From Swiss-Prot:
InterPro entries per UniProt: ATPase_NBD (IPR043129), Heat_shock_70_CS (IPR018181), HscA_NBD (IPR042039), HSP70_C_sf (IPR029048), HSP70_peptide-bd_sf (IPR029047), Hsp_70_fam (IPR013126), ISC_FeS_clus_asmbl_HscA (IPR010236)
Coiled coil (UniProt feature): none
Keyword Chaperone applies: yes
Keywords, sorted A to Z: ATP-binding, Chaperone, Nucleotide-binding
Organism: Azoarcus sp. (strain BH72)
UniProt lineage: Bacteria, Pseudomonadati, Pseudomonadota, Betaproteobacteria, Rhodocyclales
Biological process terms in GO annotation: iron-sulfur cluster assembly
Keyword Oxidoreductase: no
Function: Chaperone involved in the maturation of iron-sulfur cluster-containing proteins. Has a low intrinsic ATPase activity which is markedly stimulated by HscB.
Protein name: Chaperone protein HscA homolog
One GO MF term attached to the UniProt entry: unfolded protein binding
Similarity remark: Belongs to the heat shock protein 70 family.
Length: 622
């Protein structure tokens, strides 16, 4: 749905003027920019008619920067200063980057995000990506004849908060106003759905250069609803290249290659992979720096066999996404293929076998994401045509919650919740007179904080002193349409408030993102048992503390035998609390409750008598 354009009366500047907005697919291997012209989404080409811009940036010693096709020839001759696949480094520390040893770059493991040393100094992946975005912005402004209102930039559905924030930072450096960060599979579904007037449940299989996502969407009368999403933020076409590169090293008995030789062979491996899409075999020929000649032939069958484990790895997220949506493969009306890597025949074959139908390939898998992003950008810019009556409902991929007493996770926003979303939940104090509360925001599917990803911490101070459990603290989670999170806490009686905009310093590791849901499923039983134990331990602590407080205040109401009975019940509960049987702890809590029933009744009577002393009965009558 188009955003409503609001202005003061008489102050609306050219209300009917078409606003220049674009969709950008910032890809690992290639990037594109698209816009809507005459109601149709089209990719914008450079002066030589090329729509795709290689995601390559070269820093030269003279201070100049080359981007795209101009930088590509220097991958082998100047590998340290020619940065390829920078998207794989966005929001990540060095330990999170796969195949570091095979890369020619001079890495610096800086706090928060890995950096690369170049002839122009240390560069972050954000700066490298900004150069690509700047080149696309300049291409768009030259093609459209004016400055851009803004851009919708696509990101993998499984990009975490740090990676999304890094993408927005790169756009700002490039002079772009970000209208929305849009998940790549969702953008593809928008392009496919509007192009084909499709309705029903569709799966989007998105295998890019560095990431994989599977999203399940329901398309109905112009509503694009994401039912579920799953994926692997460190699996893509580059991994297929790397496997073929390793095969070449093994067959040619090269170990270890020089930086320049490694880059040459990696490029030859990628060329061979692309040839195998159309041919049954491909020749890999390369002259090494030593003068040695590499001359190998790889068949399509051999390549499929050596990368079968990677294809299988994509099917895990496929199964999980369908399970989360409550669907079976036969419930899917069509499978939209996205990303150049999906052109590989054994990928097409595996998807067809799993879903029992041939995947949809009537839109260019390299361009479909940019085309969908352009459609969304056109709507968000306010260029709404009469037929543009549609709504986009995206989701959050992993649950968000808070740490509670005992190291437990209270999930506030469950995974696959529709974006944007705001969810509030009330919490209370644990101790009498508590005037502050610390909040720990976490992300993940496990029951214990130790098994989830820490996102942020903040404190709420100035809570009025009250009895334990009397204060009401309302905590609100807000996730915007870009998938970025903010959390606020407010004490309801006093109005004191604190908040935090979640900006983690680095992203989830590869295994953490792809494994969170798997671990959540596999360990659900153990997690629930651990949660039950922690809950009973916390309740035991609360009951013991409350009982001891009552004994200190009104112990004189008990005789020696009664006091001894309650003390014995407290000691027994303390011993049980140190154990691992949550049922035994629950029984101990119940036993202490029974032991204090008479004491509680006497305290109530004592309080009532104290309140009535010195007053006449008619004073309390109305």
């Amino acid at each position: 749905m188009a955003l409503l354009q609001i202005a003061e009366p008489g102050m609306s500047a050219e209300p009917h003027k078409h606003r220049l907005a674009v969709g950008i697919d910032l890809g690992t291997t290639n990037s594109l920019v698209a816009t809507v012209r005459n109601g149709l989404s089209v990719c914008l080409a450079d002066e030589e008619g090329r729509a795709m811009l290689p995601s390559i940036v070269r820093y030269r010693a003279d201070g100049a920067v080359q981007v795209g096709h101009a930088a590509a020839p220097f991958q082998a001759t100047d590998p340290k200063n020619t940065i390829v696949s920078a998207k794989r480094f966005m929001g990540r520390g060095l330990k999170d980057v796969a195949y570091v040893e095979a890369m020619p770059y001079d890495f610096e493991d800086a706090p928060g995000m890995v950096r690369l040393r170049t002839v122009q100094g240390v560069k972050s992946p954000v700066e490298v990506s900004a150069e690509i975005l700047r080149a696309l912005r300049e291409r768009a402004e030259a093609s459209l004849g004016g400055p851009l209102t803004g851009a919708v930039i696509t990101v993998p559905a499984y990009f975490d908060d740090a990676q999304r924030q890094a993408t927005k930072d790169a756009a700002r450096l490039a002079g772009l106003e970000v209208l929305r960060l849009l998940n790549e599979p969702t953008a593809a579904a928008v392009a496919y759905g509007l192009d084909n007037a499709a309705e029903g449940v569709y799966a989007v299989y998105d295998l890019g250069g560095g990431t994989f996502d599977l999203s399940v969407l329901k398309l109905s009368r112009g509503v694009f609803e994401v039912l579920s999403t799953n994926g692997d933020a460190a699996l893509g076409g580059d991994d297929f290249d790397h496997r073929l590169f390793c095969w070449v090293l093994d067959k040619a008995r090269i170990a270890p290659p020089s930086t320049e030789d490694a880059r040459r062979l990696q490029l030859k491996a990628r060329e061979a992979k692309e040839l195998l899409t159309a041919c049954e075999s491909a020749q890999i020929q390369c002259r090494l720096a030593s003068g040695e000649e590499v001359d190998l032939v790889v068949t399509r069958e051999a390549f499929a066999e050596m990368t079968a484990h990677l294809v299988k790895k994509t099917l895990g997220p496929v199964r999980k996404a369908l399970r989360d949506a409550g669907l079976a493969p036969e419930d899917i009306k069509g499978v939209v293929m996205v990303g150049g890597a999906t052109r590989m025949p054994h990928i097409q074959r595996a998807v067809a076998e799993y879903f029992g139908q041939e995947p949809l390939n009537n839109l260019d898998p390299d361009k479909v994401v940019a085309l969908g992003a352009a459609i969304q950008a056109n709507v968000l810019a306010g260029n709404r045509a009469s037929e543009d009556d549609w709504l986009l409902l995206d989701v959050i991929p992993l649950s968000l919650g808070l740490e509670t007493m005992g190291g437990l996770v209270e999930k506030v926003v469950p995974r696959n919740s529709t974006l944007p979303i705001a969810r509030a939940q009330e919490f209370t104090t644990f101790k009498d007179g508590q005037t502050a509360m610390a909040f720990h925001v976490v992300q993940g599917e496990r029951e214990l904080v130790a098994d989830c990803r820490s996102l942020a911490r903040f404190e709420l101070r100035g809570i009025p002193p009250m009895a334990a459990g009397a204060a009401r603290i309302r905590v609100t989670f807000q996730v915007d349409a870009d998938g970025l999170l903010s959390v606020s806490a407010r004490e309801m009686s006093s109005g004191v408030e604190a908040s935090v905009l979640v900006k983690p310093s680095y992203g989830l590791s590869d295994d953490e993102i792809s494994g969170m849901l798997r671990e959540g499923m596999e360990r659900a039983g153990d997690d629930m048992a651990a949660r039950a134990l922690r809950e009973q331990q916390v309740e035991a602590d609360r009951v013991i503390e409350a009982t001891e407080h009552a004994l200190a205040a009104d112990g004189s109401l008990l005789n020696a035998e009664e006091r001894a009975s309650i003390d014995a019940a407290i000691d027994a509960l303390r011993a049980l609390r140190a154990g691992t049987d949550h049922r035994a702890i629950k029984a101990g809590i119940d036993a202490l409750s029974r032991a204090t029933d008479e004491f509680a009744a006497r305290r109530m009577d004592h309080s009532i008598r104290a309140a009535l002393t010195g007053h006449k009965l008619d004073e309390f009558q109305t």
